[in-house]
From Swiss-Prot:
Domain of life of the source: Bacteria
The entry's keywords: Cytoplasm, Elongation factor, Protein biosynthesis
Main location: cytoplasm
Protein name from the UniProt record: Elongation factor Ts
Molecular function per GO: translation elongation factor activity
Record PANTHER family: ELONGATION FACTOR TS (PTHR11741), ELONGATION FACTOR TS, MITOCHONDRIAL (PTHR11741:SF0)
Record's keyword annotation contains Cytoplasm: yes
Annotated InterPro entries: EF-Ts_dimer_sf (IPR036402), Transl_elong_EFTs/EF1B (IPR001816), Transl_elong_EFTs/EF1B_dimer (IPR014039), Transl_elong_Ts_CS (IPR018101), UBA-like_sf (IPR009060)
Parts forming coiled coils: none
Family: Belongs to the EF-Ts family.
């Protein structure tokens, strides 16, 4: 099959491998990008791939905390200009509050709920679209709860480009919980701890690392030990509690929270537009679109 330049570019961005290596990997795997990543890793050409999610859409993430409940919300706009608009920022906060007040479980259910003004969220969104002049949409939200003996950590990076909500058990130190939220914003772990990693993912990683070691020409009798060592390192890279804490790399996140009497039990990290693709237009088409 013909391998498109766009696919090669994506594989290069995700693996850091050279253009010809990427093209060969895609050819060998019939254009399957995930298999091509494994191929490059097994050959020792690429490290573990970056997340596939391409950040393209605009908007804001907001975290709202009320007592023992907290909500994290993402609302999308078409342009970054609108995301910086004060009216849009107020709208995002208003919707986050409504998520907590309504206890809605889905976006569709949330849209039907009534605000204190008597309008539904759907009517409020349409009103904002009319005022701001751009398509706006509530993309997702999640609610977390805690006890009086626990703490929420809320952190917004770049004014809401990234938002993190952490739940720390056994400590009411909100500053420590926020510091861990900041760590998660920066490092972007996938899990709280290795206990959350599915066996399927561990087995897949183990197989890739085994092929990598064999392709390096390592004796089979030491391959297993090497694989387990590399697997531990991989798990450290994706699990928050095992990572070196960004504000104090001499200790892990787990050790930092333990010193405060707490333990990380949950987190939610939203990055605006992750997994979404912006419509691709060249400058000439953009100008034509504005002249219509």
């Amino acid at each position: 099959m013909a391998i498109s330049a766009k696919l090669v570019k994506e594989l290069r961005e995700r693996t850091g491998a050279g253009m010809m290596d990427c093209k060969k990997a895609l050819t060998e795997t019939d254009g399957d990008i995930d298999k091509a990543i494994d191929y490059l890793r097994e050959k020792g050409i690429a490290k573990a791939a970056k997340k596939a999610d391409r950040i393209a859409a605009e908007g804001l993430v907001h975290v709202e905390v009320k007592g023992n409940e907290a909500a994290i919300v993402e609302i999308n706009s078409e342009t970054d200009f609108v995301a910086r608009n004060e009216g849009f920022q107020e709208l995002v906060k208003e919707i986050a509050n409504q998520v907590l007040d309504s206890k809605a479980e889905t976006v569709d259910a949330l849209l039907e709920t009534k605000l204190s003004s008597g309008k539904t969220v759907d009517e409020r969104m349409k009103e904002a679209i009319s005022t701001i002049g751009e398509k706006l949409s509530i993309r997702r939200f999640e609610i977390r709860t805690k006890s009086d003996n626990d703490a929420f950590g809320a952190y917004l990076h770049m004014g809401g480009r990234i938002g993190v909500l952490t739940v720390v058990e056994g400590s009411t130190d909100e500053e420590a919980a926020k510091d861990v939220a900041m760590h998660i914003a920066a490092i972007n772990p996938k899990y709280v701890s290795s206990e959350q990693v599915k066996e399927e993912e561990i087995n897949h990683e183990r197989e890739v690392l085994k092929q990598q070691a064999l392709n390096e020409g390592k004796p089979e009798n030491i391959v297993e030990k090497m694989v387990e060592g590399r697997l531990r390192k991989y798990l450290q890279e994706i699990c928050a509690v095992d990572q070196n804490f960004v504000k104090d790399p001499d200790q892990t996140v787990e050790a930092f929270l333990k010193s405060k009497g707490g333990k990380l039990v949950d987190f939610v990290r939203y990055e605006v537009g992750e997994g979404m693709e912006k419509r691709e237009e060249n400058f000439a088409d953009e100008v034509k679109g504005q002249m219509k």
